[in-house]
Amino acid sequence: MKLAILSRNSTLYSTRRLVEAARARGHTVRILDPLRCYMRIAADGFSMHYKGRPMTGVDMVIPRIGASITRYGTAVLRQFELMGARTPNPSDAILRSRDKLRAHQLLAAKGIDMPVTVFGDNPDDTVDLLSMLGPPPHVVKLNEGTQGRGVILTEKASASRGIVEALRGLYANFLMQEFIGEAKGADLRCFVVGDQVVASMQRQAPEGDFRSNLHAGGTAVAAKASRAEQQVAVRSAKALGLSVCGVDLIRSARGPLVLEINSTPGLEGIEAACGVDVATRIIEHVEKLRKP
C-alpha cells in the first residue's frame, strides 16, 4: 500500500511511530507537509502536486493536521479523497471535531451525555444565558481551542459575565459549560481505533489547575475504561465520522460525560502510559479500510 502521512514535522513522535509501524508491515510511506501540497480542481479531474512534482497513486492518507492549519490541511485531504485515496478520518469529520459547538450538537443529537453547554451572541442575553447553565463554577472554552488553551474556570457569576463581555469584545467564538466538581481535575482519554478502544489513560491536572491536558502540565497513568465508557467513546467517534481519535471523558455522578474529541491525538503520552503499540493498531486498521 502506498501511504501518505500529512504532517508538518517529520520528527514528531507520532509521525515517526506511524512511519515505523507502516514500514514494518511492508508499506511504502511518504510524509507530506500539507502546506507544500497544492492542487488543480477542474471538471476534467483533480490533481495534486508536492514540491513541484505530481502526487499520484496514493492509496491511503493518514492526516496529522494541526489546529492552526485546519482549513488548508482539510482542503488537501479532501483533494486526495476526491482523487480516490482512502483515509481513516475524512476531511469533513475533522472539521466537525475541530468545531466544539458543532461537535457537541452532533453528540447530543445521538443521545451522548456531556456537561451542559450554552452558547449565545447578544450581550443583552448574557444573564439569561448563564441562568440556563446554572450556578457557578462555569467553564468557558474558545470554540476552536486545543491542548487546554483558551479554557477558563470562573468561580462567580460576576466573573462569568466579565469573561463573556471580554471575549465578545475580542469577537471570539466561545461556549460555556457546567463545571463537574466530582471529577477533581481528572479525565479519561480513550484512544479509539475502528470499533474499539485500544488504550486508555487517566490524566490528572497539576496542583491548582483544572485542565488535565498533558500540554498544560497534566500527568497520565494507564487506566481501565469501563464497558460503558468504551461504548460512549466509540459512539462519539462514530457520531463525528472518525475512526481514529482520542475521546476525552470525565467520570461524573451521572456517568461518563464527553468533554472533547481529538481527531489528531498524540501517540507519545498514551503509548508511554499504557505500553500499547497504538501506531501498529492504526496501521492494521487502515489496511482493513483499504481492502475492497
From Swiss-Prot:
Binding annotation for Mn(2+) 2: 260, 262
Residues annotated to bind Mg(2+) 2: 260, 262
Keyword Nucleotide-binding part of the UniProt annotation: yes
Keywords of this entry: ATP-binding, Ligase, Magnesium, Manganese, Metal-binding, Nucleotide-binding, Protein biosynthesis
GO biological process assignments: protein modification process; SOS response; translation
Annotated binding of ATP, by residue: 141, 178-179, 187, 211-213
Domain ATP-grasp: start-end pairs: 104-287
Amino-acid positions noted as binding Mg(2+) 1 in the UniProt annotation, renumbered to this chain: 248, 260
Similarity comment: family membership: Belongs to the RimK family.
Name the record gives this protein: Probable alpha-L-glutamate ligase
